[in-house]
Amino acid sequence: MSTVAYPRICPFCESACGLKVEVDPGSAQIIKISGDPDHPLSRGFVCPKSQGLRSLRDDPDRLRKPLLREGTEFREIEWDEALERAAAGFKSVIERHTPSSIGLYTGNPQAHIAPLQMAVAGLLGAMPALYANSGSIDCYPRFLVDVYLYGNLGHVPVPDIDRTDFFLAFGANPLVSNGSMFGASNLPQRIRKLQARGGKLIVVDPRRTETARVADEHFAIRPGSDALLALAMIDTIFSEGLANCGRLTASVSGLDDLRTAAANYDADRVAPLVGVSADRIRQLAREFSSASRAVAYCRVGANCQTFGSLAVWAIDCLNIITANLDEIGGAMFPAGVLPQFMNAPYIDGQPPHGRWRTRVSKTPELGGTVPTTALWEEIETAGKGQIRGLLVICGNPVLSNPNAERVAAALDDLEFMVAIDIYLNETTRHADLILPPMDHLKRTDFTMIWNNWMVEDTVCYSPATFPRDPGDLDDWEIVMGLGARLSGTDPARFERQSAEAYLASCRPGLPRFPEDMTVSEALDLASGDSMPERIYDVILRTGREGEAFGAYPEGLSLQRLQQTPSGINFGPMRPGRMPAAIDTPDRRLAVAPPLLLADLDRLETAIADGFYGDNHFMLIGRRHLRSNNSWMHNLQNLAKGPARCTALMNPADAERIGIVSGDSIRVRSRVGAIVVSAELSDEVGVGVISIPHGFSRELPGSKLNLAHRLGGANVNILHDDMAADGPSRGAAFNATPVDVEPVGTRHAKGDQRRGQAQ
């Protein structure tokens, strides 16, 4: 058999690894998916998720034509009718109510689809909407700290794992996540190299995760206590005279206030709350501060909790006060060949936070978006400006948002809903129209947002693997078609206007954009078979390494990138971006932002109220290597194997409430209850229960046959939307207090104190 191998960017996580997709041209079937050995970042590494491209293409449940709701059923319609109906529906909502009656929700895949990122900006110009996205679920505390500490929502510090000697990871499982907000493909090998050169990996996590198993030391803290541990370390560093901001000393403000705040969380006080001895906390602080090159990093476990902003802030401060910020081996700020697409600095003294507030709860915006919890209450609450129409793009908030039953009820309350999605799932079943984009392998691909978080400055372009079929539309075309109809503009003109507006917003971050050239002129000169490709070309030509329309003949362009099918690597992160890149009003790193210091009062209240006590279970999540949120549970080659939607419990807790592995338990929180199978393991400590998210039982109207046959429970029925992080209002998926009881098991000994049903 003669096959053809196509280079491809894996679209399933932030590492954006390089793949080789081997195809039989005659049958148009995928024969093999493997790692691309020539990819300059992943270098042949591949994880199981990559194999999902085959199942995703062949999935019989995948939608291939638009669906229109008729009563409780859906029927297929053609694209022109679908887009006309979608635009007419939103216009009708606006006419009956107000222009502020539309909401927009975008899910995680948006960040993996470069044209969709650009298209959403154009759509918001045609249909202003209250915008919530999945960033408020897993990133808001990170972004808020970036704003107040560094002055820019886009300044995300990335651990320099390849050159560090001491990697301290809070609430992160990079062996499974492949690195989150930390683009470092093949992390197993990078960690082995760290340890081979004499470095240490320390993991702070309530569960003995896959990463914790290979760590030099694992601190099994109580869920939700990351901020307490980091503050105790800060106090030790200050009190023992170990603090040193290095070359950035003159560019740091608030050190005295930080020292005073941390002094209230000395190791002796914090130890019983965290579950780590005071001596070990102090020793960890000494080891971290004395390492020649150290970095503290945190992700979802520390970020997605009720004290997420405090945790991220305190962990970042560890890097600053030990001279490990913006230094080789520390926390660094990539300056990629592409512009910082999340660039949002202070403007005239105003941070990109709180410039306006929502109607109902007066929740402050962050970077122009609002927390998803604010979106649901805007749908529920009557009055002028109530959200009555909603567009959901590649998201499944019924499975991914806290208090999931409230989310589903809010969707039922809408007058009109459109979903751009490839499945009839737990969320899209509520829609009036479902608009499915074509197979990912039929479109070109380009790394964009992830370049801003990569440990090596890598840029890649992938040609389409398969030809399009008649009637196929990609995400860009769907959104542009909807926007044109909403604005009453010729589609080609709307596309051009959207492209020009997008490039104008990028221009400040394009150092080689000719001063005497307009964005319209640049687009006219650009190459590419589609408008998104022409945008890529302009960005590449005018970025840091660009050829600037002939001024630098050896520079970068789309054509040059296409001639290097595995991508181009411009080297590792470079130190020295600070202090020039600090965007706070006084151009100093603000280690004691008043907003975060004020949130310590809420932490004190939680301590006093027994939040860290032992009178309830603490629920945490967990990742699986063969899954990503709810994306992959309907893909045969990834969903096979043992059941994954189980509740990990410590054997001592199981004995106390009278269950064994495989028994059903009822887990109950303030907002809901689910029944799930127990799996006993000493991976979690006493009082901790771990359930993954993205699973669901079959709901009326949804069509995910494999996922529903495998079953599972929606853990987000348990997570409390009112327990959100205080300063950012980001969602809390870890350290949710719950009670546990047996369900119909002969092993039950009756209710126990921990786990008693309420």
For each feature predicted by the language model, list its residue ranges.
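Long, contiguous, secondary-structure-rich segments that constitute the structural scaffold
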Residues: 465, 471, 475-543, 630-648, ...
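Flexible, glycine/charged-enriched surface loops at secondary-structure junctions
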Residues: 99-101, 243-248, 295, 326-333, ...
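Glycine/threonine-rich phosphate-binding loop and adjacent beta-strand/alpha-helix elements that clamp
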Residues: 441-468, 478, 483, 487-488
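Active-site phosphate/pyrophosphate-binding segments
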Residues: 233, 251-372
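Extended redox/cofactor-interaction regions of prokaryotic respiratory oxidoreductases
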Residues: 117-193, 199-204, 228-231, 317-429, ...
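Flexible glycine/proline-enriched surface loops and loop-helix/loop-strand junctions
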Residues: 171-173, 214-215, 264-268, 297-302, ...
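N-terminal export/assembly segments and adjacent metallocofactor-ligating motifs
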Residues: 1-240, 277, 361, 365, ...
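Catalytic, metal-anchored helix/loop core of enzyme active sites in primary metabolism
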Residues: 432
